[in-house]
Amino acid sequence: MNVFELTGLLLTLTALFAWLNRRLIGLPSTVGVMLLALVFSLLALAAVPFGANVAGPAGDLVSAVAFNRTLLDGMLGALLFAGAMQVEAKKLFSERLVVGLLATLGLGLSTIIVGTLTWGVFIALDLGIAPIYAYLFGAIISPTDPVAVLAILRRAGVPKTLEIQFTGESLFNDAIAIVLFVALSEVADPNVAASLEPGYLIQLFSAEALGGIGFGLVVGLAGFVLLRGIDDYKTEVLITLAMVIGGYAMASALHVSGPLAIITAGLLVGHHGRDKAMSEHTRERVDTFWELIDEILNAVLFVLIGLEVLHISFSTHAVIAGLAAIPIILVARFIAVSVPITILRTRRSFTPHAIKILTWGGLRGGISVALALSLPDSDARNLIVNMTYIAVIFSIGVQGLTISRVARLARTDDDAAASEKTT
């Protein structure tokens, strides 16, 4: 199957699942298409003993797509840019301490807690897996992906500050987690680890992260200058596309963080570019274009997550480890959210029940699956892929469908407390 045929088949499946969800089910788009793709995959597997070989061609499709490369080298830049474009930079700046601590300290705490407790699971199940892979799993599963839940949060009436915290954290901790994953992967590789010098990982992390932000500023400023020089929405859309695709490719060639570069460029264009370099007509067209790109790519991404079950070989021990990881991840998320908020409570106020909502709304998604699939073939890789997939399906399927209820309950508690004070 060539690229054109793959793209056509994948878009057709995505459109079909999106139509079925909108027409018959009515779930949030990304959650609905993922669950429909998952049901389709499970039915295809169940039909194999009866002679209906749907799972084979569908599995070939998933293999040919190469989920990790498709996301990390293709879709991720556009998704991050679209997300950054929608963020109100002034409000994000006002939440910089919260977002910064959640995306760094919170991510680090989650990685350590998940890694340590997962190592305990490895020992309890006598899996014989090296401890470094437990911490790799921690880095893989810790970044949040609230794309699927933001629309639900808005519908539930969550305050704007909490939306900004969710969005800002997810954008930056996705990018930072990828850098952390690369660093831990080098430690896990015995051929590389033996030659590593003290301080190398800190140097690598700093070069990737700071280099990515610096390069993103260059791309964003260059894009701003080009956008300000013309007033033609078709050309300006093309410029933003070039910033994403060309900028991401160049960042990879320069060995700096492509995700951080694109986020930085997207924030610059979304704030300064939209206000000072685009006419109102162009702003509407550019916003509509990137909103559409965001919706389409997210739908395709979550369909791929649902279909990925056809390509994963599950084992009993791996499934048990994956199920055990779910409460571990939730506990780690609770601590990773609680510590930064507790530190900052002396300096500012927070939305009531912020810890509860940020904990339960911290969904895991495609980034985690892609990172797990990018590991080199080994028993440890198969285990981590199993665990990651189970955790992601639970996160999107259970947390994604119940976060609005959690938000409403929190709001109801606040209303009840307020009425008691007035009586």
What are these regions (language model features)?
Residues M1-T423:
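Transmembrane helical cores of multi-pass secondary ion antiporters/exchangers
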